[in-house]
Amino acid sequence: MQWEIVALNNPTFDTPAILKKLADVLDREKRSKGAARRKSETGFGGGSARKSFGSNSVSTPPMMNTRTIKRMAGHSRRVDEFSSSAQAKASATKRAKIGGASGIRFDFTTPTKSGALAVSSPIAATTSPICTTGAYKERKDMGKIEIDHNSALEACKPQEKPVEIEILSKVDDSRYMYSTIEQRAEELENQMCEMRQLFKQKHGWEEDDFSPVGFLSAEPVLVCGRICCEAPNGKLNAKSLLLEGSRIHSNGARVKMEVESTLPVYSLFPGQIVVAKGRCPSGHTLHVTELYSEIPPESPKVDNQEKQSLSMMCAVGPFSTQEDLEYEPLEDLLGVVNETQPDVLLLMGPFVHDKHPQIASCLPTKLIEDTPVALTFQDVFTFLLTRIAASVENLKTRVVLCPSTEDIMHHHISFPQPAFHVNMDQLELKDRQQMTFISNPGIISINGISIGVTTQDTLLHLAQEDVVKLDKNKPKKMRIARLAEHMVTQRSFYPLFPPSQEAMLDFTKRRAFVMPVQPDLLFMSSKLKHFVNDIADKTLCINPGKLTRGKNGGVFAKIYVVPQNVDDKGLQDEEELKKKHSILPRTKVQVIRI
């Protein structure tokens, strides 16, 4: 049945319509087989009467089973709402098929738009989507400190006045995923030319010092290009490394790179722009002897930064467990906010997760006075924002919200994303500046401290593609820190190309995820384990972890930037001054279980 395969692979099909169609097809098959059986019994065509097959010999079609209905009802996801009803209807269908029933009928009642759900609705039939089974409430190690970075430092007190938040970079609204191959190729070319110019400025090279990629030479030459894989859809390794030149300087030529036997250490990934020095006697293989890949941006200049302090809390969605949409973990987090009253609360999406069982099945509900009420996606999002606004209304805490590509309520599904469009009148805040909506990615400045934020899982995608050779004689750097460092040294919140399918990247908006300045703090969301690491000499990279993990609680982060009193009158060296004013030695980070 070809339509079944189409249905399984098309999440937009309506579930009741699918099951009704399935019932009709099975009914037609039953009638067809019944006619064939009568034909064989009467010996149609002049032959003798044949033995009649018993009803038990008619088997259920291979596609029609409980697992199939579960997949069709949940669009290949585990949706609790349909599990009980699907199993019951699967058993009824099988009995009807074996017993020779005259027909199959399914009864699916559409839930009401508002008010209490009908008793006959799939949600009312089971309590699992709207009642907590206790997995979150029975969690252990509440308040346990998982990471204590710079534990010797004391937590600083919140400031007496609300802090000022300045947005340093943002993403404008535009038509996303509306581009041609020529436009994407042009952006790739522009990126390579810009990075080439930055390499020249940093190392003092001239244009005459460079040669085209693939230039035949027995002497060492300098070439600039992008790392790519020899196989179009293959995984990068030391044997499949290619260097692709720009169209304007190398006519887009590619040359194989030999690094395994010539370089003691390297860390490469597809899309990385590098300058390589080596010999290319055949014109087909470049024997690399030197590799330049780091070109971090400058830090923003701020006066009197040593006098500034900052207390923050940061949490990454989902903010509700998969059992319900009650947002209990968020309520617990807001309780901690009321106790500690930090200067800033940074919340990173998803806020209404598109993979939540109730959201994926388009049946969001909430308990209101012990009664399940059907909600729209907008209802859930508005309730969430209203609850956050109400919890900080009487505090000096500023709230910063960054969206995610997994947010069902965001109007922009590709990366990079502009900020949420929110009607502030609905939140009824006395001070509208108390909530700030930033883009994904975004860079903000608070008390002279620059903060980069992204919910794109760049770390996971880099971890799946990088090729590395480490120096055994040097201290081993954490892999996570090395991957995060690529973002800063390549000046991009997403330096990988071609991107992962999960990234939903719109490369024509490349300039929107370029890192214009090197942030002091870099917050990123990743499925990888939470961590805190110094990267690129100036940046503290923080993955706070998820606030929830399935049905269980997760972690959040507390950040304290302690003011530094340094007598720098005797310091004449600029680099020494930068080290003294760095926030790395005066930042305390705690990752705590909710």
Report residues per predicted region:
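Extended recognition/assembly regions associated with phosphoester-bond processing machinery
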Residues: 1-594
